[in-house]
Design a protein with these regions (language model features):
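Intrinsically disordered, low-complexity Pro/Gly/Ser/Thr-rich segments with frequent PxxP/GP/PP motifs
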Residues: 53-87
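Polar, enzyme-active/binding microenvironments
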Residues: 38-64, 89-97
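C-terminal interaction-tip segments
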Residues: 1-33, 91-108
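Residues that cap or initiate secondary-structure elements
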Residues: 27, 40-42, 54-56, 70, ...
Length: 108
């Protein structure tokens, strides 16, 4: 089994929920860290979710405020394990307001 560290990014996330990362087939992924930066001119509320093929979708963050010009480092030593076809999603209450960085390790 190979372990590969990767960085996934998504710029200008807004009101429409965006898929930041979809786990490839035959892969398990460990989410090591998520950083959300507010690039808008005002504060905004963000959400992070996990969509699963089994329809057990969950919110990991919901309506968490990020002040103007600030960022939120989400995970702080915790890990989340994602399985094949799981999707990590992000949204905001303000259009084009969030840049997201996702640090992961894929196990193939």
């Amino acid at each position: 089994m190979a372990n590969t560290f990767k960085l996934k990014t998504k710029a200008n996330v807004g009101i429409t929920t965006q898929n930041v990362y979809v786990v490839p087939s035959a892969t398990t992924t460990v989410v090591i860290g998520i950083t959300l930066a507010n690039t808008s001119g005002a504060g905004c509320l963000v959400g992070v979710g996990i969509t699963r093929p089994s329809s057990d979708d969950v919110k990991v963050l919901k309506n968490v405020p990020i002040p103007q010009g600030s960022s939120l480092e989400f995970m702080s030593g915790n890990k989340v394990v994602l399985e094949a076809a799981d999707t990590l999603t992000i949204n905001s209450d303000t259009n084009n307001s969030i840049d997201a960085s996702l640090t992961i390790m894929e196990i193939t």
